[in-house]
Structures are given as C-alpha cells and as structure tokens.
Design a protein with these regions (language model features):
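Aromatic-rich peripheral "rim/lid" segments of glycoside hydrolase catalytic domains that contact
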Residues: 371-380, 386-389, 400-476, 710-727
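Short, well-ordered beta-strand segments enriched in hydrophobic/aromatic residues
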Residues: 465, 492-501, 637-645
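Glycoside hydrolase catalytic-domain groove-lining segments
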Residues: 256, 278-377
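Active-site-adjacent substrate/metal-binding segments within catalytic domains
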Residues: 28-119
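Surface-exposed, glycine/proline- and aromatic-rich loop segments on solvent-exposed faces
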Residues: 476-597, 655-684
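Active-site groove signature of glycoside hydrolases
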Residues: 134-139, 143-146, 157-229, 250-262
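Aromatic-lined substrate-binding rim segments of carbohydrate-active enzymes
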Residues: 81-153, 158-159, 238-254, 336, ...
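N-terminal Sec-pathway targeting helices
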Residues: 1-16
Length: 727
C-alpha cells in the first residue's frame, strides 16, 4: 500500500511538473522542424485577405476596441464575467462589426466566451490581440533595450501566442494582464497581433540617442533597412521572435503590427510645427521588412483621432504632399466652402506613405459632458458631443478611413469606463476613487457605445419634464407662495426639481444659491444684488433655454486654482480673492486646442470652454427627443435639472468629499468631507434674503449600482455598417 501511494504521488508530481513546464513556461519540443507553417490571413498590397472556402477574399476591419472596465471596478480587476462577454459579443456583431480588438491578455473568461460564441458560427467574430507595455516602463529612466522593456515585451508576446492557442496557465500576473487557465484554442479566429502601446516619444528619442549603433536587426523573419532607428530595430526583434515562436510551436502565422499614433508618426513636419508640438521622435514600420519566410504579413496600426494632434491644421496645404515624399491627391479633403478635412488628409498621408495595409485601430469621440479639445475643422470634438452626434461622427470618421484607402478601423470603444481620467479634470478629483462614481465632466470615461447608467434597473430621475418620480419626501425647502426645491442624487448627478406656481419660464430669472462648504462662500451677490440665508458657493441662474448657467464664487473657482497662470497669466495664490468675495464667475474648463497659442505664442492664453452653461432638452433615453447632454427641462410649473458632481467641486461623491479652500494653507486642491449642502430659491429683483434649506448627503462607498444601455450612437453605426454602406 505504501509503495502504491508513493507511486501515485510520484506520478501526480510528474504530471504537475509537466503541466508547469508546458503551460507556465512555454517550453516545447519542435516535433516537425521541417513543416511549413500555415495561415488563413495575409496581406496583399494594401489589403487584408482571409481564406474562406479555399479562396482568398478581401477583408475590411469593422472593429470595436474592448476594455476591461465595469462600474465599481478598476481595469486591473478583470471583473467582466463570461456571460457578460457573450451578451456583448452578440450586440457587437448585431451592430455590423466583424472584429474585436483587445489591448492585453484578458482573463480566461474572455477567451472561453469567445470560443463558445464562435463555435459553429458561419460568420464568426475575429480578434486582434494586443500586448501591452507597462506605463511605468514607458515613463521612467528605462530605454527600450532595458530588459524590463524589451525582454518583458518579448516574454509577454510569446505568452500571448500560447494564450490564443489554449496552451497557457497564468496564476500570477502583472496588473496589466489577466490570469486563469487558458485551455481554449481560439487561434482560428485571431487575424492578427498588435504589439505595444502608444509609444512615449521621449522614450523613443532617448533610446535612439543612447544606442545609435543598435539600429540594425537581421532575423529569420524580419530585418531592418538601412534607414532604421534603434527603437525600430528593437521592434523588429520582438516581431521576429513572435513569428519564429508561433511558426515553430504551432506551425501557424497571422498578421502582426506595432502600435503607433500621431505623436510618433513617420512624418517630418515643418520646423515651427515640430518645435511648437515638441515632436521629438518617429516610428516608421516601413523600416521593418519581412523575409520570404513570412506567409501572413505586416500591417501598420495607428490610433488616429480627428482632434489629436491634428498637425496638418498647422501645415500649409501646399506642403501636405511633401510630407509623404510624393504627390498625393487631397482634392476630396476640402469641403465646398474650402474648409479642409484634415483628418481625411492625414489618413491619406498614412496610406500614401505605407506599402502595407493601414488599419486605424483606434478612432472615436466622447459623449462626456466635459471637453478636452475641439476639432478645428470637422466638429468631432474630444467631449461634449451628444450620443447622436457621436454616432454621426463615428460614421464620418469611418468614411474618411475608407476613402483614404485604409484597410478598416476599430471604434474606441465598446463600453464606457468609469475608472478613466482626463488631464484637464485630474486635478479636481480623488483619482484613487474614480471607479466608484460616474464623472460626467471627465470625457475619457464616455467613449463607449454602451453606457452604464446609474441605478440597478433605471436611474432615480430622468430630466424630461415628467415629475412623477418626485415625492414630498424629496422636498428640501418650500416657501409660502407654494414654491419649493426638491433634490435626489445617484452615482452621476445631483437632481433638482424647482416648483413655482405661475412660473413664466424664460420671462423671469430664477436663482438658486447653493452652499457646499463652510470654508468659503458669500451671503451677497455683487452682480445681481441678491442676498442669501447662508454663504453660497454657487449660484444657479435660470433665465430660459439659451442663457442658463451655474456660477461659482471666484475664490472657489477650481479652474483658477490650477490653471490661472495658463488662462489669465496671473498667479492668484499671490493675491487670492477674499473668502467672502461677492463675485460669482462663469465655470470653464481648459482645452488643449493650440490654435491661438500657435498663431501668437507670446500673447494668447489657453483656450477654455464654458462648462457651466446649461443645455435645455429632454434627457430621457426612452424618448424620441432624447438629448444625452441636456441639463434641464421645463414643463408647466416645474423645472427639472441635473448637475454632474464635479461641476459642484465634488472630488469623490462616493464618500462625499469636496474641495477645501484652495488658498488657506493648501496651495492647491485638497479634499474635505461634507454631510449636507444648502439650497434656496429666489428670483432676480427680489429684495428680501433668500432662505435656504439643508439637504443631507451620504456616500455609497464602494457599492455602486448601474445598468447597461446601448447609446443612440450604437443604432446609428449599426444602420451604417449593416445597411450596405459599411464596406
């Protein structure tokens, strides 16, 4: 018996050791060293072809990028389960998409769901699988030849190959990579790999300067030309190792590409543009060539948005062709009124430059209420676009992509992601908590076609003029004339119901003073002459459909606290407003648009966008007149209104944290807790002080509620992609 137990134990240990060697280290023995690899996908000139029914057929990428975010979770939680993926895959294919792009190895639930969804399906979904590069590695002292960059990228790339072939187990992983048992072979639906992230230009430049002699690579599958830079030689090695590994272990090949974007695009712009935008590096995959052992092919992958960086808007149109080094026809890149479509022109430059297929693997616009950048020519902005406008912009972008001669593109992104951050709101929020609330001011959270709206099945309020969801329990303060203010809130908005008998909307001006912090505020408004029962930090002014806005006391203006030098040229910390200053200001966001500064670098301040200006409309997604950017609506004697938390200087409503006084010992934005705010209702011209009532606030911590909703943009893109115009 003892011998039997020992034998069984030994066998189990051997099996475990074999499992670890094969599924965790990538070890293999090439049993068919002379076998030629096969491929079902290849490039032919600037097109991609798939082999179907024994014939090569042209394939155009109609793709969607998919992230890992869910409300209440960070990207690194990998919280999306198999059933959710299956539901999403069906919705994506019903929209007319044929490809999903992911950025890194996801949890095993994704691959199990992908396998199950495609099984027996005549028209499957295809996958573009990515390999991520750690953000710290790209933004540190390391160069691209550091083992933590180059070798780690190689290791992750080979691991990715095992994952899609169902031959890997990952129990402990980096935070940018999922884990699990990867036992499903989905390789028959993986058309290609996209290696890397958006390259940091300083890392590329640093690598090239540090290793000028390492600008050549000669491999079995890839080699560099004489014009290659060291960073490109590093990429060639990574790609060569990928092709060699998959060809030897699995006798297969598929397409490959390296991530790129405008910041490191291959063009040499005029000196003034290069200097102004500090463009210090290029990555050109034309310097990486394939040997005759490559049966699949290489494509050029770009993240390209209409508004970023939009270099061509600063280059004279007569010089556009010179960037490609050949004559390029841009005649269809001008509107009838002469306005250039610099996005289409840029895409045309890319296809003119490259000899391989060009795939725009990221393009999109955001439905967030906030904005970070305006598109100068086409109006496809980074933020503050309605869901309908988003859909129209996506269709226009895809048309530009195809008319420029690209092999397709992938929309960014499938779902909204609450954990995301944006450079022009990062100063205003607690970035350790943004996964637990929906910040409508942060545009980066709202690029998705799928929204996660607050509430388990529906939101607590829809601003549409129907006040049936309001009750007496919501009343904060009421007045002798029957007027009242009621409030609710959820993970995205503070909602207000303003009731006033005999309301003459648009003919009288209503004012709501709001007191959020005891550190600042004023009981008197210099501009209106109104007096308040408490020191108000904000003033909500309702003048009608076109001229209603939220104002902030100048001392509590978050833009000034972080960007006054950029916008006004003044340092307000040297001479801050008084704590009880009676001045109220409009609320603005700083933008990245550079036109004014580029034209007159010495005199122009940064451009801003009035985010406190309120938009009238119906915010109920169930209604035909739905406007996702609508802030308020009037019906009879009632006004319904919603304000995003950050607009009222909440840094983390999940724990009810707001901004402290910027100037009293903080020298910047710090956070303090609050348990209530005060609100009142008055009108321009009244002489008596406006009484204010208290409204209790209680955070929800890490427990969030949300429900999925397909945006209007989904329907618009679906009609385009399935209606015969999606190519």
């Amino acid at each position: 018996m003892k011998r039997f137990v020992l034998s069984v134990t030994a066998i189990l240990l051997i099996l475990l050791a074999l499992f670890a060697v094969i599924f965790q280290t990538g070890f293999y023995i090439d049993m068919t060293p002379n076998a030629l690899p096969t491929t079902f996908v290849r490039t032919q000139g600037q097109t991609i072809q798939l082999q179907k029914d024994g014939r090569w057929q042209e394939f155009t990428v109609r793709g969607v990028n998919m992230g890992t975010g869910l409300p209440g979770h960070w990207a690194t939680d990998y919280a999306i389960d198999k059933q959710t993926y299956l539901r999403w895959f069906a919705q994506i294919q019903e929209m007319g998409a044929n490809t999903i792009r992911v950025y890194s190895i996801l949890s095993d639930d994704f691959y199990n769901a992908f396998y199950e969804y495609n099984q027996g399906r005549e028209e499957p979904l295809y996958l573009l699988q990515g390999v991520w590069v750690n953000d710290y590695v790209q933004n540190s002292h390391m160069d691209a030849f550091d083992d933590r960059f180059r070798q780690k990228l190689i290791d992750d790339t080979l691991m990715m190959v095992d994952v899609i072939h169902g031959q890997r187990a990952i129990f402990v992983s980096d935070d940018y990579m999922g884990s699990g048992l990867y036992l499903r072979d989905i390789s028959q639906w993986v058309i290609g790999y996209i290696l890397g992230a958006e390259w940091e230009d300083v890392t590329v430049a640093y690598t090239n300067e540090k290793y000028p002699d390492r600008n050549s690579y000669q491999g079995e599958y890839l080699y560099t030309t004489g014009d290659a830079a060291p960073f490109e030689a590093m990429l060639a090695e990574v790609g060569d190792r990928l092709l060699a590994y998959e060809s030897a272990r699995y006798n297969e090949q598929r397409l490959f590409a390296f991530t790129n974007w405008e910041t490191t695009d291959p063009f040499s712009y005029p000196e003034e543009v290069t200097r102004f935008f500090r463009k210090c590096a290029t990555v050109d995959v034309e310097h990486i060539r394939t040997t005759d052992r490559v049966l699949s092919g290489q494509f050029a992958s770009y993240h390209a948005y209409p508004y970023y960086q939009d270099f061509l808007s600063y280059v004279d149109r007569s010089q556009w062709s010179a960037l490609a080094g050949k004559e390029v026809d841009f005649s269809d890149c001008l509107a009838a009124d002469g306005t250039p479509n610099s996005y289409r022109a840029y895409l045309r430059l890319l296809t003119a430059h490259h000899t391989m297929p060009v795939v725009i693997s990221e393009f999109g616009v955001s439905t967030g209420r906030g904005m970070a950048q305006r598109d100068q020519n086409t109006g496809r902005n980074q933020g503050h676009m309605s869901e309908s406008e988003q859909g129209e912009a996506l269709v226009a972008c895809y048309e530009d992509i195809m008319d420029a001669g690209c092999a397709g593109g992938a929309v960014f992104s499938w779902q909204d992601e609450w954990f995301k951050r944006t450079w022009n709101t990062m100063h205003a929020i607690d970035m350790s908590r943004n996964a637990y609330w929906s910040d409508y001011q942060t545009n980066e959270q709202y690029f998705g076609l799928l929204s996660f709206d607050p509430g388990k099945e529906q939101s607590v309020c829809y601003v549409d003029g129907d006040v049936s969801e309001w009750s007496d329990a919501d009343t904060v303060i009421s007045y002798e004339d029957g007027s009242s203010v009621s409030m609710k809130y959820d993970e995205r908005f503070l909602y207000f119901r303003i009731h006033k008998p005999g309301l003459r909307f648009g003919q009288e001006t209503l004012v709501l003073p709001i007191d959020t912090t005891q550190k600042t505020g004023t009981t008197y408004s210099e501009g209106s002459g109104l007096r308040f029962g408490r020191a108000a930090d904000f003033l909500l002014v309702l003048r009608g459909r076109e001229d209603s806005r939220l104002l902030v006391q100048d001392r509590y203006n978050a833009l000034n606290a972080n960007y006054s030098q950029n916008v006004t040229g003044k340092d307000l910390y040297a001479d801050p407003p008084e704590k009880d200053s009676p001045r109220f200001e409009t609320i603005h966001m700083i933008l990245q648009t550079s036109t004014r500064v580029f034209r007159d670098e010495q005199q122009a301040g940064a451009e801003t966008f009035e985010t406190g200006l309120l938009r009238y409309g119906d915010a109920n997604p169930a209604h035909a007149a739905f406007d996702s950017l609508a802030d308020f609506c009037c019906a009879g004697e009632d006004i319904e209104l919603k304000l995003p938390w950050q607009l009222l200087n909440f840094a983390d409503p999940s724990r009810m944290k707001i901004h402290d006084d910027y100037y009293d010992g903080n020298y910047g934005i710090e956070f303090i807790p609050v348990s209530r705010l005060w609100v009142g209702l008055g009108s321009i011209g009244q002489t008596e002080r406006i009484p204010m009532g208290a409204y209790s606030l209680r955070g929800w911590g890490n427990t969030v509620t949300s429900h999925e909703r397909l945006k209007s943009s989904y329907t618009i893109l679906q009609a385009y992609w399935t209606g015969g115009d999606g190519r």
